[in-house]
Each structure stands twice: as C-alpha cells, then as structure tokens.
Design a protein with these regions (language model features):
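Short, conserved catalytic/metal-binding motifs centered on acidic residues
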Residues: 11-25, 52, 99-108, 123, ...
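Short amphipathic alpha-helical "interface-anchor" segments enriched in bulky aromatics
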Residues: 21, 208-240
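Charge-patterned, long linear interaction tracts outside catalytic cores
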Residues: 177-206, 220, 224
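Electropositive nucleic-acid engagement tracts
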Residues: 1-27, 89, 127, 275, ...
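Basic, amphipathic alpha-helical segments enriched in Lys/Arg and hydrophobic/aromatic residues
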Residues: 235-290
C-alpha cells in the first residue's frame, strides 16, 4: 500500500490515534461494555475500538487497531497501554524523515510520551489540566490566571480561500516527569473562558503557535476515517459468535476492505482538495459492472460469429 502511494515531499508523516464506539445492543457480547461519551450524555452499550492511522498529503491510511476489552474480561488493558503496544510495533515508511504523533487529551500519559521520545518521534497532543510543572503548580492554575492581553491572534489556511483564526499563547515550560516542552494555549475567540482553552504540548524544536495548532487540527482526519469505516466498509456491523477472536477478525476485515479500496482506486484521490471513500466505492462498483458488461458483450459477439 505505502509503495504505490506517492511519498510526502517534506518527509513528514503524522501518526494519529483516536477511539470510537460502535453501538451494540447485545447483552451477551464478549467485548461490549457500557459507556458514555462525556459527563453530560447518556449511557449506551458499545464496542470500543482504538484506531491508528498514517496521514500525509491527502492520504489517510489505517495501519493498526485494538479493541478495548471490558475491565471484567481476561487480558484487559487500558487504552494507553494498547496504544503503546501499537507504537512499539509501528514501522515508519522508508521515505519518512519525521514522525509526529497527534492525539487528544486521553492519550498523553507519562509512559507514552517517554516511549515517543525514545523512538525518536515528535508529538503534538492536547494535555489535561491535571498535569503539573516541575515546581508542582498545575496547568489549571496557569491557564486560569493567565492575563487575556497576552494572547495573540494567529491564523492558517488549511485549504485555499479558507482561513481559520485562533487566539494563542506560547511558552517554554518544564513538565514534571517529561522535561522541557513547548506549551500552546489556543482558543477560538479572544473572550473565551479558561474552560474553553485548549492546552497543546509538543517537543518539536523551534515550533511556532501557528504550526502547533495547524498540526493538531489535522487530527480531524481520523474522525473522517472512522466515519468512512463505519459507513463504507461496515466497521463493527458483522454478526459473529461469542468468541472474542472472531470479533477482532470482523473488525480487521473492515480495515482490510478500506485498504483494498484505496489500493484499487488510489488514482481517484486528488493531490489537492478533499476526497471521500464513498466516491471511491462508487467508482469501484461502476468499474466492476462495466467490466462485467464488456465481458458479456464479447461472449455474445463470439457466439454470434
């Protein structure tokens, strides 16, 4: 797959991780558990899945996944532990010069950040407010009491003729257990409250606030990937038996079908601008139908002759 796609011109590849739930109503499913998306939403039963993807240019390629088992199930592991296993097994493309790990606030644990640094990768992640500096002060106090006039207006253009504007503050700090990093406070409006301020952390050298925010916003590609996996290849929709191994294989089949779709129709992906797996699936179906019609016509002409 990676051999047929054109490499990134700058040699930079993003390793993006995110979790999702596929709702399941079965009460005897071995891997389904009760959960909710946030403190304000209701509970539901679903199959929790971690997905890791590579992103460069217009491409988004799923490379690994793990199912988060219920706490009462055997071989249970926390999502961060599963993510570290996938990080350990990850082999960068041969042309990749820089690997940047992008994730939300649920993944930057101490062991995870240390593993990223040990492997020589960089990270751009959102931090929880419970993290502390080397002087034992919390990020929450820092964000809450930072004066508003220190924020500066910044923007970038993810696509032509479309500008995204943010208010940001950047500083070099020393985090406990991690060391010196660059922290970026980002909010969409100047008068937003501290609760609406996003805390971003990176170990990229000489990174600007504009670059850090632009890299973190590319995490949206994994949301598009999850939507396409659920709608195009039926992620988690297969009805299988109670064996956990068969459930894992059913999820793997959805990712393999997505990879095959990109392999067959990668020429339909534009180098600039958005694209969708729905379009690739439609083009693939039309191509297969056209081949079948042409084959039938050739047989009829051969019989008539």
């Amino acid at each position: 797959m990676l051999q047929v796609l054109p490499p990134a011109q700058d040699g930079v590849v993003l390793l993006i991780v995110d979790g999702t739930y596929k709702e399941k109503t079965a009460k005897k499913h071995p891997l389904v558990k009760k959960a909710r998306l946030d403190a304000y939403s209701g509970y539901f039963r679903g199959l929790p899945i971690l997905i890791v993807m590579l992103q460069w240019g217009p491409y988004r390629i799923p490379i690994d996944f793990e199912i988060v088992r219920p706490k009462t199930a055997p071989h249970y592991q926390r999502p961060n532990a599963l993510f570290r296993q996938m990080l350990q097994a990850f082999v960068p493309p041969a042309w990749a010069q820089t690997v940047i790990v992008v994730a939300d606030a649920g993944f930057p644990a101490k062991d995870t950040l240390r593993l990223i640094q040990k492997r020589g990768f960089f990270f751009v992640m959102s931090l929880a407010r419970t993290w502390k500096f080397a002087d034992n002060h919390t990020l929450k106090n820092w964000v809450t009491h930072l004066p508003k006039h220190l924020y500066r207006k910044t923007w970038f253009t993810p696509v032509p003729q479309k500008r995204r504007i943010y208010w940001s503050y950047i500083d070099r700090k020393c985090l406990r257990h991690i060391g010196d990093v660059t922290l970026v406070l980002s909010k969409k409006r100047r008068n937003d409250s501290p609760k609406q301020t996003k805390i971003l952390v990176t170990n990229l050298p000489e990174a600007t606030a504009q670059q850090v925010i632009a890299l973190y916003t590319r995490r949206w590609d994994v949301e598009l990937l999850i939507k396409e996996l659920k709608s195009v290849t039926g992620l988690g929709q297969a009805q299988v038996t109670k064996h956990p191994e068969r459930v894992e294989r059913s999820v793997a089949l959805s990712l393999m079908a997505y990879l095959l779709l990109i392999r067959f129709r990668y020429r339909d992906i534009p180098l600039q601008g958005p694209w969708s797996a729905f379009t690739l699936k439609r083009n693939f179906a039309w191509h297969v139908a056209q081949q079948q019609i042409e084959h039938t016509v050739r047989l009829n002409l051969k019989k008539a002759a």
